[in-house]
């Protein structure tokens, strides 16, 4: 049970977090236990965590702020072991270095800074940048469907996550259908058998440029014409030029 001082201090800090949240961080206490806080870190841009959503806990001692909290990260992230106490200068691993003037915001800013670095500690793990990116992409799904505590503490984020995950799924579906329907001849035209600039003979290059301009002119003169047929014509022309050069 929290002391009156801990209760007062954590209540004040929650108000400050709501009014002025740190970048990429939100945090709130468990409604039934003010000593148990939950946080969500959004992966910053230009890091392998970009787009990731990382849920974790801060477990405060009853005599906070005179002793530091235990820090854990629950969402798989590639930087820390899941649901494991982390050895940081502001965690309960180091009560000797703890400063009672530090706050929840200070702790979580420090955690984010350590997360985006490469220093090792008790509770940290080593993974590749690509592995971290893959976990970042999966993190929203994990929090939304695999973490009961996340759903209980952050129901409004769960709703937003579901909407975003549905949007991503539809986007992937649309892209997949587009790739399946694309005319192979049109695709070949876009890939071009040969570039005009690669034609070595100056006279051949001039003739090719003139022929391409004529094709483009004919295409532009037909506003209702088929773009596919235009690309096919260009592809065949460049393919024949390539054969001629061989």
UniProtKB/Swiss-Prot annotation:
SMART domains: UBCc (SM00212)
Catalysed reactions listed for this entry: S-ubiquitinyl-[E1 ubiquitin-activating enzyme]-L-cysteine + [E2 ubiquitin-conjugating enzyme]-L-cysteine = [E1 ubiquitin-activating enzyme]-L-cysteine + S-ubiquitinyl-[E2 ubiquitin-conjugating enzyme]-L-cysteine
Membrane-spanning parts: 225-245
Xref: PROSITE patterns: UBC_2 (PS50127)
Family: Belongs to the ubiquitin-conjugating enzyme family.
Active site as annotated: 87 (glycyl thioester intermediate)
Entry EC no(s): 2.3.2.23
Name of this chain's protein: Ubiquitin-conjugating enzyme E2 6
GO biological process, alphabetically ordered: ERAD pathway; protein monoubiquitination; protein polyubiquitination
Single Gene Ontology MF annotation: ATP binding
Primary localization class, coarse: endoplasmic reticulum
InterPro entries reported for this sequence: Ub_conjugating_enzyme, UBQ-conjugat_E2_core, UBQ-conjugating_enzyme/RWD
Gene that produces this protein: UBC6
Superkingdom of origin: Eukaryota
Membrane-side (Cytoplasmic) residue stretches: 1-224
Record localization: Endoplasmic reticulum membrane
């Amino acid at each position: 049970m929290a002391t009156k001082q801990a209760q007062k201090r954590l209540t004040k800090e929650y108000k400050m977090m709501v009014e002025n949240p740190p970048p990429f961080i939100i945090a709130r206490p468990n409604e039934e236990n003010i000593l148990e806080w939950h946080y969500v870190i959004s992966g910053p841009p230009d890091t392998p965590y970009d787009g990731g959503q990382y849920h974790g806990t801060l477990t405060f001692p009853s005599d906070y702020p005179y002793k530091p909290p235990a820090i854990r990260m629950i969402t798989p992230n590639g930087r820390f072991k899941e649901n494991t106490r982390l050895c940081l200068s502001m965690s309960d691993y180091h009560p000797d270095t703890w400063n009672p003037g530090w706050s929840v915001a200070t702790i979580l800013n420090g955690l984010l800074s350590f997360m985006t670095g490469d220093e090792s500690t008790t509770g940290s793990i080593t993974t590749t940048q690509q592995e971290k990116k893959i976990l970042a992409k999966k993190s929203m799904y994990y929090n939304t469907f695999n973490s009961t505590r996340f759903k209980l503490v952050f129901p409004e984020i769960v709703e937003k996550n579901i909407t975003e995950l549905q949007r991503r799924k539809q986007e992937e579906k649309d892209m997949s259908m587009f790739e399946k329907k694309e005319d192979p001849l049109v695709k070949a035209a876009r890939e071009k058998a040969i570039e005009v600039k690669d034609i070595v003979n100056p006279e051949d290059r001039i003739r090719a440029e003139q022929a391409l301009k004529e094709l483009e002119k004919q295409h532009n003169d037909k506003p209702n014409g088929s773009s596919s047929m235009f690309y096919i014509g260009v592809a065949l022309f460049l393919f024949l030029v390539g054969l001629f050069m061989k």
